[in-house]
Amino acid sequence: MDHDDEFLDKAIEGLVLYAFNKGEVCTAPSRALIHEDIYDEFMARCLTRIAAIKQGDPLDTETMMGPQVSKQQLEKITSYVDIGIAEGAEVLIGGHRATMEWEFADGYFF
């Protein structure tokens, strides 16, 4: 396998893991700097990886991400998205509460 491709795979996985950790990492960064030469491919692959994340019941072994831990955390995330949009940010994927269909679908899914 090409070393550049392996590096890109690791960088994508790192970005996805830091951005989708539900606040469980004390050192979670808030930005990523992507070189313009690889930006388009990097973002396309990140969005594909993010779209593959299965939300749902934390007790289901197929679930990759459960709900946020509290209403306050969900509201904080929502407020950050709203601020970003108000300041001109473009939402590339998601950006709203997830629609779930199961027993605890009213949980704090985003």
Where is each model-derived feature located?
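ALDH superfamily catalytic-core signature
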Residues: M1-F110
